[in-house]
């Protein structure tokens, strides 16, 4: 099961978040609780729990685990599952950024596969808080860290028929779904991940997708096979 974290404060304020470590809103906490309830209804016994190193994902997972009565679960955290680094756009309001650069340019920065936003300069107010040698990431850059991590650490567990829960971010999830569903870089531009809506994916023995569904069908997004 894959879950994008519940709504964060900057999601609500329509600000580019990336590697900035912001909290969940009250709505985001409710979304995580609902996700936990939906997951519990599936009666799945999980063997491993993965998340990023950012607290909006960590806290979403903790809320879900409370619903599942798994407060002592062994959680595996990795920066490889972090949100895409939004570079110089970090903390900027999306609507104001559109006014400044135009909707097409912002869409390319947000949704294209291989175009990174402007680099985060040393003078950026979040440079020291994020403290990363990475200045900006395209979805391709995110793909290059998420997919190898999945292949090395998670795919072997799936081969052993283990049940896995991953709580992470919109773009790291988009990158992984590109791999799992063979979504093209042209199609991924219009592909969005809803917050707090668990995506249940079942695999064949050869790791081909057997079936998939969002557990809350009222907030589902279509996934495109072989696009």
Give residue ranges: language-model regions.
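Short catalytic helix/loop segments, enriched in acidic residues and glycine
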Residues: 18-35
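Amphipathic, non-transmembrane alpha-helical scaffold segments
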Residues: 25, 29, 50, 54, ...
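Phosphate-coordination/substrate-recognition cap region in phosphate-metabolizing enzymes
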Residues: 35-123, 178-202, 226-227
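Short, hydrophobic/glycine-enriched beta-strand segments
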Residues: 1-5, 166
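Active-site-adjacent alpha-helix immediately C-terminal to a catalytic or transition-state-stabilizing loop
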Residues: 58, 66, 72, 140, ...
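Surface-exposed cleft-lining segments at the edges of enzyme active sites
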Residues: 127-143
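Glycine-rich N-terminal loop/short-helix segment of MobA-like nucleotidyltransferase
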Residues: 7-22, 42
